[in-house]
Every structure is written in structure tokens, then in C-alpha cells.
């Protein structure tokens, strides 16, 4: 590990183990969240402020779900960085029926320490609350660090008497059943699929592409360039988009940034992507999509929720000719552009959360 990496790791450790916990224990002068004790509340937390619109879509959809399914509760949003300084105030203003919902995503495990350690802080601190972990992907690496982090997670998760875990894929579901045996575990799709942006009329033109360029991509740079060249030769100019936009996004700007991206997708004739939320955004906007598998199980298993949608097609071996053929197939196929049938998976979820249905 380089000296720069060591410095970054140490700075993050100080933040998570010293600065943020001290804000909780000492109390912060500026309480960012106000809540009334006479009103029952759902605390929605672990909310992001980085540049990944996939995570922001999860936060946006989670709030939409709670507002629709829990109209009798106030929804109190708490950003990940603010939960430490807000926790005591929220507990002091507790209503007996208050609950905590933690947004889902792909940050459960040892890869994203900030998110995982904050999740554990929430579970420990709100020990006497009903705590619901919304659909997540878990990955603890088979390393000394990964095994150590898993052991800590098991201790904290299993000690909470009212923790409900949701897995958004089969691999995570089996992992949770094996390692968090004392918890109730549900399998649910990514919360973004609760949304529907397929009804807006749109003139569609052109093929769009959104491919990863990091360690999660199954494509090497040369392969990625060959795929793009083949698409350009077949369809002309290929427009690119990304779900990581290079600027921080807040609760105030979240909806604007998401709607801008969804509007762009609604203007596409077809999309080629290897990003989980690139695929999911196509499903909710009714946009034909060719899905290229990623390095891990995340996209492959996420596709299982969408495989019956006629305008979605998975390519496991992404040779350029296969990709262009799949795009042509979708462009010439007459299919309904209805979005994801959310009622199939989300109807009755409130009863499952309360333990009244299985």
C-alpha cells in the first residue's frame, strides 16, 4: 500500500472512529434535524451526498415508497454524515412507533468502510427501534480484513432485536441467511424499481452507451473500444452518458439531476450498458436496453428481476457483433414499453416489514 493510500485510510479512520462518534457523545451545537415527539416518524438515513446517481435514485425511490406506503408517518431524512450529530436529538424526540429505515445499495461489506461503519453505528445506537435495511447487495471479501469486518457485522447485526434485512439478489440472500441467522431476511428488488417513468411521451432517436471503466467492468479497454466502434459503424454516432456525474449531489438537487438523466434516456432508441442502475433506469423509463454483464454477480442477478420485460436483453459474452445484433433485435421488435410491474414485488411490503405477512 502506498504512503498516500495509508494517509487516506488513516484520515478516514480518524473521521469514523474519532470525529463523528465525538459528535454523537458530546452533542453537536448545530442539530441538522428537528423532529417532534408527538408525531410518529420514519427516520430514513445513510443518504448519500456523492456523485453516483444510482445511489441517489435509491434514496429518492425509498422516500417515495415510504411516503406512499406510510402516509401516517412523517419521513425524516438524515444524510449519512449527519446521523452522528442528529442521533441523540432524534432519540430524545422519539414517538413509541418511530422506525429507522436504512437505504440499500451495494455498500454492505468491507469495500465501502464509511457506509458500513455508519450502518453499524445506526444499528447499535437505535437498538430499541424497529430498524429496516432496505434491499442491499452484501460483499465481504475472503481476506483477513473481510473476515474481520464480517465478524464485527455479525456481532452488531445479530444483537439488534428488531433488525430486518432485505437482499436485492439471490447471492446476498443466501449470504445473509448463512451469516445473520437470527434475523428476518427478505428478498426484494432494488428500490429504484418502485418508480415508474415509462408513461411520459418522448421522441426517441439514437443509440446511447454507458460502460464502466473500473474494476467492476468485464471489458478490457480494447474490448470496450471494439464494442463502441462496432456500434458506431452500425448505427452512426453513439451518445454516451454516465451515472457518476463528477459533482456532489444533495437532497436539494437530487430530483433535478435524476429527472435530467431519465429525460435523456427517454429520448434514446436503445441503450447499451453494464451498469446496474443504467439497466434499471432503462426499465423504469421504458427504454430498450442491451445489458452486458459486470465482473461480479450484481448485474447478472439484478437482471433476473427484469428478464421478463421484452425490451431488455442480456449479453453474457459481449463480442461486438453480438452487441450490435442485440441492439438491432430490440430496435426492430414491436413491444410494449410499459415499465417494471412494481405491484408484483412491492405490494404488501409494508405488511412484510411489520411481520404481518410473509
UniProtKB/Swiss-Prot annotation:
GO biological process, one term: polysaccharide biosynthetic process
Description of what induces expression: Repressed by SinR.
InterPro entries hit by this protein: Polysacch_pyruvyl_Trfase (IPR007345)
Keyword Transcription: no
Keyword list, A-Z: Exopolysaccharide synthesis, Transferase
UniProt GO molecular function: transferase activity
One family name in Pfam for this protein: PS_pyruv_trans
EC code: 2.-.-.-
Task performed by this protein: May be involved in the production of the exopolysaccharide (EPS) component of the extracellular matrix during biofilm formation. EPS is responsible for the adhesion of chains of cells into bundles.
Record-stated family: Belongs to the polysaccharide pyruvyl transferase family.
Record protein name field: Putative pyruvyl transferase EpsI
Taxonomic source organism: Bacillus subtilis (strain 168)
Gene (name only): epsI
